[in-house]
Amino acid sequence: MGGEALTLPKDLLDFSGYGPKELQALLDLAERLKRERYRGEDLKGKVLALLFEKPSLRTRTTLEVAMVHLGGHAVYLDQKQVGIGEREPVRDVAKNLERFVEGIAARVFRHETVEALARHAKVPVVNALSDRAHPLQALADLLTLKEVFGGLAGLEVAWVGDGNNVLNSLLEVAPLAGLKVRVATPKGYEPDPGLLKRANAFFTHDPKEAALGAHALYTDVWTSMGQEAERAKRLRDFQGFQVNGELLKLLRPEGVFLHCLPAHYGEETTEEAVHGPRSRVFDQAENRLHTAKAVLLTLLK
């Protein structure tokens, strides 16, 4: 693909090493790829290893399809096959894969695993989700908001729910994109105070206070993969934090609903919200593809 070359850090584990210019350039590239429905041979002959400890619909599919659309291939390796950190040390997995492939996308339980992969592998490593961050999701979120509102600077985005990895990445990109984030979580489920401070985010334990007048209202599941033993307690603790039609009424008239999916209806949201007129949930899902293309095209080319 023609155009000015974009230089980014070797790995995308989170957004450290990114400034407003790098983030904007990546989003601009994703917009262009989407607009042109781009297909090319930029990554012809190149292979991406998908090293997944967790199951996935959007992340696996979009990364595989992105590689196909760019002329490359993806190889899927799940935990049963590899046993990363169990059957074989992370360092050894990294040193093997760097001999076979041009990049690694890792979906892991512990962020330390993806950090170790990046430290030991000479090829680029992309964090396809860890307990600390979900950068690919944050890029899709930003692209969706930009499409809806025409820009990002000054938008107020409310987060209602768990102070989890998706929120962490949103807080990371907020100051780079000029977003104003308003966060509401139950007591005991707050995000990293350092991230809140760096994002200059507003924090409350009241969902209505966070949602009032926002451009977008964002939520995620109350119980993430690996937290199943906490499910009953979480269901109790998160009562009152459901994003439903009543809470969505507090947004601006043009306000939209975001969810990274999968959705657990009757818990953090409702079927009516996800499939309602304010929802941009499936635009977010589609934009996972275009932003994945932008990342892979930049890091692997």
Curated annotation (Swiss-Prot):
<dbReference type="Pfam" id="PF02729">
    <property type="entry name" value="OTCace_N"/>
</dbReference>
<dbReference type="GO" id="GO:0019240">
    <property type="term" value="P:citrulline biosynthetic process"/>
</dbReference>
<keyword id="KW-0055">Arginine biosynthesis</keyword>
<dbReference type="GO" id="GO:0016597">
    <property type="term" value="F:amino acid binding"/>
</dbReference>
<feature type="binding site">
    <location>
        <begin position="260"/>
        <end position="261"/>
    </location>
    <ligand>
        <name>carbamoyl phosphate</name>
    </ligand>
</feature>
<dbReference type="InterPro" id="IPR006132">
    <property type="entry name" value="Asp/Orn_carbamoyltranf_P-bd"/>
</dbReference>
<dbReference type="GO" id="GO:0005737">
    <property type="term" value="C:cytoplasm"/>
</dbReference>
<feature type="binding site">
    <location>
        <begin position="134"/>
        <end position="137"/>
    </location>
    <ligand>
        <name>carbamoyl phosphate</name>
    </ligand>
</feature>
<dbReference type="GO" id="GO:0042450">
    <property type="term" value="P:arginine biosynthetic process via ornithine"/>
</dbReference>
<protein>
    <recommendedName>
        <fullName>Ornithine carbamoyltransferase</fullName>
        <ecNumber>2.1.3.3</ecNumber>
    </recommendedName>
</protein>
<comment type="function">
    <text>Reversibly catalyzes the transfer of the carbamoyl group from carbamoyl phosphate (CP) to the N(epsilon) atom of ornithine (ORN) to produce L-citrulline, which is a substrate for argininosuccinate synthetase, the enzyme involved in the final step in arginine biosynthesis.</text>
</comment>
<keyword id="KW-0028">Amino-acid biosynthesis</keyword>
<keyword id="KW-0963">Cytoplasm</keyword>
<dbReference type="InterPro" id="IPR024904">
    <property type="entry name" value="OTCase_ArgI"/>
</dbReference>
<feature type="binding site">
    <location>
        <position position="165"/>
    </location>
    <ligand>
        <name>L-ornithine</name>
    </ligand>
</feature>
<dbReference type="Pfam" id="PF00185">
    <property type="entry name" value="OTCace"/>
</dbReference>
<dbReference type="InterPro" id="IPR002292">
    <property type="entry name" value="Orn/put_carbamltrans"/>
</dbReference>
<dbReference type="GO" id="GO:0004585">
    <property type="term" value="F:ornithine carbamoyltransferase activity"/>
</dbReference>
<dbReference type="InterPro" id="IPR006130">
    <property type="entry name" value="Asp/Orn_carbamoylTrfase"/>
</dbReference>
<comment type="pathway">
    <text>Amino-acid biosynthesis; L-arginine biosynthesis; L-arginine from L-ornithine and carbamoyl phosphate: step 1/3.</text>
</comment>
<feature type="binding site">
    <location>
        <position position="220"/>
    </location>
    <ligand>
        <name>L-ornithine</name>
    </ligand>
</feature>
<comment type="similarity">
    <text>Belongs to the aspartate/ornithine carbamoyltransferase superfamily. OTCase family.</text>
</comment>
<feature type="binding site">
    <location>
        <begin position="224"/>
        <end position="225"/>
    </location>
    <ligand>
        <name>L-ornithine</name>
    </ligand>
</feature>
<keyword id="KW-0808">Transferase</keyword>
<dbReference type="InterPro" id="IPR006131">
    <property type="entry name" value="Asp_carbamoyltransf_Asp/Orn-bd"/>
</dbReference>
<feature type="binding site">
    <location>
        <position position="107"/>
    </location>
    <ligand>
        <name>carbamoyl phosphate</name>
    </ligand>
</feature>
<comment type="subunit">
    <text>Homotrimer.</text>
</comment>
<dbReference type="GO" id="GO:0006526">
    <property type="term" value="P:L-arginine biosynthetic process"/>
</dbReference>
<dbReference type="InterPro" id="IPR036901">
    <property type="entry name" value="Asp/Orn_carbamoylTrfase_sf"/>
</dbReference>
<feature type="binding site">
    <location>
        <position position="288"/>
    </location>
    <ligand>
        <name>carbamoyl phosphate</name>
    </ligand>
</feature>
